[in-house]
């Protein structure tokens, strides 16, 4: 189950912008009139949104796109889909089928999550002076939940709703930064990395990548990968990420409690 790049970028733009801002106005119009704007020119879109041509160009740059041509290409190739969890016409059966899949997804996390790796991540959380937790849409929800839990445990961490702001932070982070990325499908870097904007160097942050995609490997941008088994479907998506985030927080709480115990 993969979300297209356009919905990700537009929803991230809406979540991070004032409802009355020009960028929100443009993003809302595109999402509400997707078929209508598929073949629109930049002049047509500006007219329909009651904004200037320069506002459309700035909107594209704010989303990390090169220009309007790239935006129009994304609009043309976007096909919104929703995965239905049950084939039954009965509401009670629909509920049961959906929740059964949710329970199965949590069981997969229980069986597959490597607690030794969780322990290494927890040590990094305790050790690094700067912590950031990022994700996209439902991944960012898991990031915010982990941020909140860490704060309750006395560890401040940073996050950003806007995807482009996450990328900017990754560009500027250094060896004092620990960055935790939640990416259910494992394609976080595919959304805005065609030109590999982050230059690899010796003073890069340590990046933990949490995903249900076992094809993701360590790279010049990813130091550690924390896997969980996943069927990569809609019912699993938010709950598996949330479960992993909660287990990280619980493990960190136990780690802190262990540090406070007097030596025998």
Segments and roles (model prediction):
Residues 5-7, 19-25, 35-39, 47-50, ...:
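HTH-adjacent hinge/linker in prokaryotic transcriptional regulators
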Residues 1-12:
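Linker/hinge segments immediately adjacent to helix-turn-helix/homeobox DNA-binding domains
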Residues 258-264:
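A short, charged, Gly/Pro-tolerant segment at domain boundaries
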Residues 126-258:
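Glycine-rich phosphate-binding loops that contact phosphosugars or nucleotide phosphates
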